């Protein structure tokens, strides 16, 4: 059976991921006019720039949908976001600033929950608005087929008939008006934005050029912290975790994770926390550039890793970072539910996150400028009395340290012999002054 359909399957049910924007509105209306039977599915992901979710399915029905459903994905989205924090599933960082994989997390939830809803309605053909150059076309493909093995894919933006008739936003707008819908294009921005309640992605258009900075972006989850005219007073915030799960902000306990994330967004957003500018590698290994917002994720991540470093030993922390980066890449590629990802998630949540209990107090200032004011946990292995510089009882003595250093002579001797072995083969040069072979200065060799 052909998985990807290049032309409209006339007379068949097609589920379309319907946002209510111009692209999906025109596509839905066009498919109905050409003889398909479109079903519209809208994901409520808590998008900060969406004002009225209930109106979206109504518009879909007006444009010819056989049926239209609004699927509440917020609870599942926040659950996956917390899991990503517990696992450190983030692989794109620049200068210490992290992209929290908020779009890949949203696609994992949307791609599974919408296709599951379609399956309930007997709809086995799925269309969405992703383009062939991006990551989402592969993410949705993978998640869709994982959820429904019988699924076929039809994307209007891969159909030459659709492209020939409605190849641009102007043509789509004219098409809607000609069909009796007073649909006016929204004001064109200098970039494109995609968002969910975990974060926002700004990319494309002017942001494709690296001489266009964050300063052209109008944040939808935070503030323009780079604008000195924007007043941002410092603020203290306390975050509490229990067994790896964020449960309280500023002493207020949340039984609803969605409400907790919304409050974390509000707190971090007041300062512009979590904004970053990243050059990343798409799934097809071409580089792209995005500017990201994730105020709540950033706040929780900072507090989580502060507790992590005070609770776990060095080797565990090293494995957390290594496996977290690996898991983040799998998430980015649309493999969040693949077996290799589940294996990494299980080990990180079971052996790392389960011990993360405690409170962290921070002072937030402008952007990603903050200070950690206090860290409290019953599980801390940080014990200041062990290494105090003050006189008093100690867990080990000077003689103990002499013995420990003496044992180091074994590997120091081995290392010295290797250095001289490298010098004999020409990999290192001998040093008359230090007595230790050294890497040659390439400048002296004219290289």
From Swiss-Prot:
Swiss-Prot/TrEMBL keywords: Amino-acid biosynthesis, Arginine biosynthesis, ATP-binding, Cytoplasm, Ligase, Nucleotide-binding
Any one Gene Ontology cellular component term annotated for this protein: cytoplasm
GO MF terms held by the record: argininosuccinate synthase activity; ATP binding; protein homodimerization activity
Reaction catalysis annotation: L-citrulline + L-aspartate + ATP = 2-(N(omega)-L-arginino)succinate + AMP + diphosphate + H(+)
Pathway the protein acts in: Amino-acid biosynthesis; L-arginine biosynthesis; L-arginine from L-ornithine and carbamoyl phosphate: step 2/3
Main location: cytoplasm
Binding site for L-citrulline: 99, 135, 139, 192, 201, 203, 280
Pfam families: Arginosuc_syn_C (PF20979), Arginosuc_synth (PF00764)
Top enzyme class: ligase
EC number: 6.3.4.5
Subcellular location: Cytoplasm
UniProt binding sites for ATP: 17-25, 43, 129, 131, 136, 194
GO biological process: argininosuccinate metabolic process; L-arginine biosynthetic process; urea cycle
Protein residues bound to L-aspartate: 131, 135-136
InterPro entries assigned: Arg_succ_synth_type2_subfam (IPR023437), Arginosuc_syn_C (IPR048268), Arginosuc_syn_N (IPR048267), Arginosuc_synth (IPR001518), Arginosuc_synth_CS (IPR018223), Arginosuc_synth_type_1_subfam (IPR023434), AS_cat/multimer_dom_body (IPR024074), AS_multimer_C_tail (IPR024073)
Family the entry assigns: Belongs to the argininosuccinate synthase family. Type 2 subfamily.
HAMAP family from the UniProt entry: Arg_succ_synth_type2 (MF_00581)
Subunit structure: Homotetramer.
Name of the protein in its database record: Argininosuccinate synthase
Organism (species): Shigella sonnei (strain Ss046)
